[in-house]
Amino acid sequence: MLGMIRNSLFGSVETWPWQVLSTGGKEDVSYEERACEGGKFATVEVTDKPVDEALREAMPKIMKYVGGTNDKGVGMGMTVPVSFALFPNEDGSLQKKLKVWFRIPNQFQGSPPAPSDESVKIEEREGITVYSTQFGGYAKEADYVAHATQLRTTLEGTPATYQGDVYYCAGYDPPMKPYGRRNEVWLVKA
């Protein structure tokens, strides 16, 4: 676990592969259109809890799996970003449902260790194309909602189309990183 934290703080962390297809923006909001590679992901779903509380429940389970709480007892190392899906209601508020996605490192993609915790699932996920915007700080539910709204507004009047029933939030930094934090909101291209 200490090795994962050290790597997260000092830069030797595997990044989820993607390709920037285009960039754009309006006023103070910029975005990238990215093609993100698919693969195998460790997932945890939490329902009936607000986003921040659901993350506090799900993230330790993912971290334990990555850190070696699996059938092989092997620590896999981190990949970034860790992403999670949010499900908006028609009024913009969020459903009490969250799904965390952690892309399994490349060296374990062929045969990922089986989770010891039954709430952690391994899922094959197709590649996706997203519209992504970035922001800093310690992100909370209100920040993700605000940045998703800003990104939607920025995409108005462009040819961009995206799914309205889900969006992803992504974090690149361990909780103890005090500054230079990177968070993103992704709208999935329709």
UniProtKB/Swiss-Prot annotation:
GO molecular function list: heme binding
Q: Where in the cell is it found?
A: Cytoplasm
Q: Does the keyword Zinc apply?
A: no
Q: Which Gene3D superfamilies match?
A: Regulatory factor, effector binding domain (3.20.80.10)
Highest taxon listed in the record's lineage? Eukaryota
Q: Name the tissues where it is expressed.
A: Ubiquitously expressed. Extremely abundant in liver.
Record GO biological process = heme metabolic process
Q: How does it assemble?
A: Monomer.
Family classification = Belongs to the HEBP family.
Protein known as: Heme-binding protein 1
- What is the protein's species of origin? Mus musculus
User: What would be the name of the gene that encodes this protein?
Assistant: Hebp1
